[in-house]
């Protein structure tokens, strides 16, 4: 009988149903180790967005406007592409674009040329034509004091045959430069007896 009571007591103690009597030894239950804390997540600061195309364009114009460097423009040649014009038109049109212009210019950190300018010259009909705008050229330097450029100009002009109503123009630009003097030119596209004109001028850095 005494042996049966001991078995029952041991079973109840194992299940945790009864408190141990004085003198009874209860085996220690090993503690479950706590899970390690997750490492703190570091916040990554939001990177500042690069300026867009329009903002960069405006910054270039504004920086060029603040430049203290000036250059003089002297219109030199107007050439009507003979492949697109009848002979009588060639004989009729003016190809001596007398005029004058002035601009502000700068070279950026990459060595490229920027300018804001205004120019007046005689058009194909011997009428005064104004042109004002912004210009940019990628510059290559094949030798000391020699520069080659290619880029574009965007601006506003007005012509007598369009009642001097202003209209925008985007045109290509190329140049050959030596020290402070440059020969610069653009080509105006068009159709038969219209457009297809090479227009060139001298540019002198003051």
Curated annotation (Swiss-Prot):
Keywords: Acyltransferase, Cell outer membrane, Membrane, Signal, Transferase. Residues 1-22 form the signal peptide. InterPro entries: LipidA_acyl_PagP, OMP/PagP_b-brl. GO terms for molecular function: acyltransferase activity. Residues 26-50 are annotated as: Disordered. GO terms for biological process: lipid A biosynthetic process. This is Lipid A acyltransferase PagP. It comes from Laribacter hongkongensis (strain HLHK9). The lineage of its organism: Bacteria, Pseudomonadati, Pseudomonadota, Betaproteobacteria, Neisseriales. The gene is pagP.
């Amino acid at each position: 009988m005494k042996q049966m009571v001991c078995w029952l007591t041991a079973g109840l103690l194992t299940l945790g149903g009864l408190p141990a009597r004085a003198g009874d030894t209860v085996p220690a239950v090993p503690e479950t180790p706590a899970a390690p804390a997750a490492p703190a997540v570091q916040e990554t600061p939001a990177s500042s967005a690069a300026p867009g195309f329009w903002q960069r364009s405006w910054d270039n114009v504004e920086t060029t406007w603040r430049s203290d460097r000036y250059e003089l423009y002297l219109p030199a040649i107007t050439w009507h592409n003979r492949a697109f014009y009848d002979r009588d038109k060639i004989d009729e049109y003016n190809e001596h674009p007398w005029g004058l212009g002035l601009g502000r210019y700068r070279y950026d950190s990459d060595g490229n040329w920027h300018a804001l300018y205004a120019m007046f010259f005689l058009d194909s009909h011997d009428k005064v034509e104004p042109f004002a705008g912004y210009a940019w050229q990628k510059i290559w330097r094949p030798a000391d004091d020699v520069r080659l450029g290619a880029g574009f100009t965007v601006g506003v002009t007005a012509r007598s045959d369009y009642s001097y109503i202003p209209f925008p123009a985007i045109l290509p630009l190329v140049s050959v430069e030596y020290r402070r003097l440059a020969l610069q030119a653009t080509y105006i596209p068009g159709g038969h007896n219209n457009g297809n004109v090479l227009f060139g001028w001298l540019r002198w850095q003051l």
